[in-house]
């Protein structure tokens, strides 16, 4: 049997996993069979790296927001219309740095597992119109044209600027 368990926090995941182990043991006893548990991987929450996030936010603000052409805005609205979302176009803003939610919504990611081993800094870049469902044809369509390209180039610049800061500032590295 293959199973996957999820929880918003690592401690909660451990408790759920212990329950799964008990269920497997009980099921094996009822069926009078042997069983073996193999843990393949985990998907834990991402540990917040506030110092790294602040360093990256500084570069995001220094670079400024992405500007979009009228044609890109029109395309974004067509994507929103096709996916049943309000036709507001694509935002050209820089959001302020916010505290990470205690239990952030969204899917699981193995980035959380990585964050338990090495510091992780995450950046969200606009590559599709607001409200576009991720893992959909609409995001793929935007990624293959200037909206997605601008977002990735912008993100690349911000990441590079942050890496230069880390290279130049050993204290920043140790604080992260």
What residue ranges belong to the model's regions?
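Metal-dependent amide/peptide-bond hydrolase catalytic core
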Residues: 1-176
């Amino acid at each position: 049997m293959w199973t996957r368990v999820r929880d918003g926090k690592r401690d909660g995941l451990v408790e759920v996993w212990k329950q799964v182990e008990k269920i497997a043991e009980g099921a094996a006893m009822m069926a009078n069979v042997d069983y073996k548990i193999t843990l393949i991987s985990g998907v834990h929450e991402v540990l917040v790296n506030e110092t790294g996030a602040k360093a990256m936010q500084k570069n995001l603000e220094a670079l400024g927001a992405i500007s979009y052409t009228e044609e890109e805005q029109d395309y974004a609205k067509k994507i929103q219309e096709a996916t049943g979302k309000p036709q507001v176009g694509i935002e050209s803003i820089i959001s302020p740095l916010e505290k990470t939610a205690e239990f952030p919504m969204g899917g699981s990611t193995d980035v959380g597992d990585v964050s338990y081993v090495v510091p992780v800094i995450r950046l969200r870049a606009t590559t599709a119109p607001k409200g576009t469902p991720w893992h959909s044809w609409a995001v793929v369509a935007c990624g293959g044209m200037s909206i997605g390209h601008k977002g990735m180039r912008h993100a690349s610049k911000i990441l590079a600027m942050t890496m230069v800061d880390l290279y130049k500032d050993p204290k920043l590295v140790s604080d992260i």
